[in-house]
Amino acid sequence: MGFFKLLFKLAFLAVLTVAIAYLFLAIFYFGTVSPSFKLAQPMDVFNRFFSKEALDTVTTSGVGATVTAPKAAAASQSHALILAAEQVANNANKLDPRFPIDGSLFSQIPGYVDFLKKPNIPAFLEKVGPYLTKYIIPLGMALVSGLIGALIINFILSKITRAIIKKRRKAKRAQQSRVDDYYYDEAPRRRRR
């Protein structure tokens, strides 16, 4: 009985982990709950929050770290990112326009633009890099977030079930003590009879 209980708990945690991981991917990578199972590049996700326009707005206006744009602007930005990605694929010698360069905070980092012009990346990383950024990193992040979420939910559920079990045990003990008291009070009367 204990083995089946453990098996059921593990299966429940596995399903919960997958569900939370899927939700993580749907929010941050697919952009929809019913995706076509094509993961976006992490730079696309990065640019949703730290695009050149957003960084420029932060530096010029002096507002906080987050900048919220209207939905139409966000849609046009995502369309521009897709076009930029296609341009990069066609012309490998030019800089990747998805990376914020001119007028952004990143251009102030020493060697940032030079690195983009001629990135000195090992051959092994050049081969593995696309798989890392497109599949391994997002799936790994989703799995970790799924595990953390599943463990948190499991902890909350175990606390609730323990509280219910304790309440039932207390009620059972109270009922048993009432029954014992009744029989204890009735015993002398029976003897008299």
Curated annotation (Swiss-Prot):
Instruction: Alphabetically list the UniProt keywords.
Output: Cell membrane, Membrane, Transmembrane, Transmembrane helix
For this protein, the parts annotated as crossing the membrane are 10-30, 136-156
Q: Has UniProt tagged this entry with the keyword Transmembrane?
A: yes
Q: Which InterPro entries match?
A: MPN454_MG319 (IPR054989)
Question: Which compartments does it reside in?
Answer: Cell membrane
Annotated Gene Ontology cellular components are: plasma membrane
Q: In terms of one coarse class, where is the protein primarily found? A: membrane
Record membrane topology: Multi-pass membrane protein
NCBIfam families named in the record: MPN454_MG319 (NF045771)
This chain's protein is named Uncharacterized protein MG319 homolog
Q: Supply the source organism for this entry.
A: Mycoplasma pneumoniae (strain ATCC 29342 / M129 / Subtype 1)
